[in-house]
Amino acid sequence: MNKLNVLIAGSTGYIGTQLVKLLCKHKNVKIKYLCGNTSVGKNISAYDKDLKKYKLPKIIKINYKLFKDVVVIFTSLPNGESQKISNKLLKKNIMIDLSADFRLKNSKIYNKYYGIKHISLNSL
């Protein structure tokens, strides 16, 4: 069986590093890209020493052109950021959001609790 190529956006926070640990142990997953904004060029092990034992790509800035190389895109980003990515997905992509952006199905309730207008209404 071919390994499933994944991209993790927001890989350096607590949720992101825990996800990296879990996926490193999965025999059918290949972490193709680790993405961040302020951590570009660094190794993920700078954020969690337990990850030193794995061969992982360096952190890069997210680029929507990368989506063609992966099937699954995990997002662990600040509120409001994952919805921007959802509008750029290809038909073959599956997005698993670990933030709050798609937690609620009603945009008015989302705005009330998070103070941000939801821009990806088709994905709710």
Language model features by range: what are they?
Residues 1-124:
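N-terminal Rossmann-like NAD(P) cofactor-binding subdomain of oxidoreductases
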